Amino acid sequence: MAKTLYEKVFDAHVVYEGKNELPILYIDRHLIHEVTSPQAFSGLKMAKRRMARADLTLATIDHDVSTKSVDLNACSDMAKEQITTLMQNTKEFGVRLLGLGDKNQGIVHIVSPELGFTLPGVTLVCGDSHTATHGAFGALAFGIGTSEVEHVMATQTLKQAKLKTMKIECKGQFQKGVYAKDLILYLIAQYGTAKGTGYAIEFCGELIRNLSMEARMTLCNMAIEFGAKVGMIAPDEITFEYIKGKEFAPKGEEFQKYCEYWKSLRSDEGAKYDESITLDVSKIKPQISYGTNPSQVIGIDEKIPKISDFKNQSEQKSLLDALSYVNLEQDQVIEGVKIDIVFIGSCTNGRLEDLKIAADILKGRKIHKNVKALIVPGSMQVRKEAENLGLDKIFIEAGCEWRYAGCSMCLGMNDDKANSGQRVASTSNRNFVGRQGKGSITHLMSPASAAACAIEGVICDNRKYLGV
């Protein structure tokens, strides 16, 4: 029977399936961080259990950490407590921790691929909603709750219902100034934040095959904003080249054997999906969010919708509520809206390729005098590689702040926050009410668009800086 990529990986990991019971999956990789792990470790201690496979668990510090310094004392009191607790727990249970000062510390969904801990065909979980990022490698990766974190720690297994499958085929090529971030924002804008609910989605097609691993991770990262639990891309030579030589990757002849197996991790010809979507990506323009959920997105040359554009009363109310919060109007042109802060980073767009894209636009230019711009590499490895290329100098000379690795302004859990009423051009993944600080206003966009906004101090078209 022909199978999809998702079905192949899922079926290969079922260790038990009783009558009228959910299948039990073996979990190959478990990522943990300081926010969703303390209760799980406490549960293990109370039950006097050890971890089933501490060697298949990797911990990092990312959500709470200060990006101004690698000194623990630079963090808030709550952050210090959570970080110290993780340090103690990982030491007690024998889990490798990428702690403050570690050359590999950074955002969980960036450091795992960097180290080759994420591999094609594995099952991977983390107490974080953006775990779908790792599906870019052909891994079956999804976020779990804290009680499930404890269960995986104790048993290295998890009960999981089998999801429906959706194919998203991307045809054509991007216009100049359009990136993977624009594609995923466009997809969510067209179909809504619930379209993927109950599905494992697979991105495929001509465009996907030509994307870098960084761009593929951006796509899969925001599968959750599309409503999907899982986003996957079949591994190929680009994947294998990215993995080769990394710390946890197979070595030598073993690597070649794995590559032969990984080549089988693609949907069979004739495999049936429960739903399919085909996109012509050549029509997509730089995308900007205008509201308070990731489906409220328009092209840079478009106007904010009018209430009459929606027939559904709940959508009409959502529009009015969003515009009231973000202080914008129906039928308003999005280009030219004043920006206070620019944030380039996060598990969506904090990789070296993202920083290169931003640096290409900022090189030789200055940011607007009324703009504060934070450039936050997703890991210390990204930071080092960027500095080796001189990107830090480009950012600093432009007037940006060059920070250490962490989740930073993606969420209001650390010191990097916007004040009430401040408008942020952000490369993160969510624009919810207060997401970047109480009363803050978020506009999601690509690193190129964010860099252009930093220069002009308003939402603008990045293509003018690319000779388009």
Swiss-Prot record:
Gene that specifies this protein: leuC
Query: Could you tell me the superkingdom of the organism this chain comes from?
Result: Bacteria
Which positions in this protein are listed as binding [4Fe-4S] cluster?
A: 347, 407, 410
UniProt xrefs under InterPro entries: 3-IsopropMal_deHydase_lsu (IPR004430), Acnase/IPM_dHydase_lsu_aba_1/3 (IPR015931), Acoase/IPM_deHydtase_lsu_aba (IPR001030), Aconitase_4Fe-4S_BS (IPR018136), Aconitase_4Fe-4S_dom (IPR036008), IPM_dehydratase_rel_enz (IPR050067), IPMI_cat (IPR033941)
CDD domains linked to this entry: IPMI
Q: Which Pfam families match?
A: Aconitase
Presence of the UniProt keyword tRNA processing in the record: no
Tell me how this protein assembles. Heterodimer of LeuC and LeuD.
What cofactors are annotated for this protein?
Answer: [4Fe-4S] cluster
Which named protein is this?
A: 3-isopropylmalate dehydratase large subunit
* Keywords assigned: 4Fe-4S, Amino-acid biosynthesis, Branched-chain amino acid biosynthesis, Iron, Iron-sulfur, Leucine biosynthesis, Lyase, Metal-binding
Q: What is its EC number?
A: 4.2.1.33
Q: What does this protein do?
A: Catalyzes the isomerization between 2-isopropylmalate and 3-isopropylmalate, via the formation of 2-isopropylmaleate.
Q: Does the keyword Iron apply?
A: yes
Q: Which family does it belong to?
A: Belongs to the aconitase/IPM isomerase family. LeuC type 1 subfamily.
Sample GO molecular function, one term: metal ion binding
Catalyzed reaction equations: (2R,3S)-3-isopropylmalate = (2S)-2-isopropylmalate
Q: Which pathway does the protein contribute to?
A: Amino-acid biosynthesis; L-leucine biosynthesis; L-leucine from 3-methyl-2-oxobutanoate: step 2/4
SUPFAM superfamilies to which the protein is assigned, alphabetical? Aconitase iron-sulfur domain (SSF53732)
What the record notes about the co-factor is: Binds 1 [4Fe-4S] cluster per subunit.
Q: Name a single GO biological process.
A: L-leucine biosynthetic process
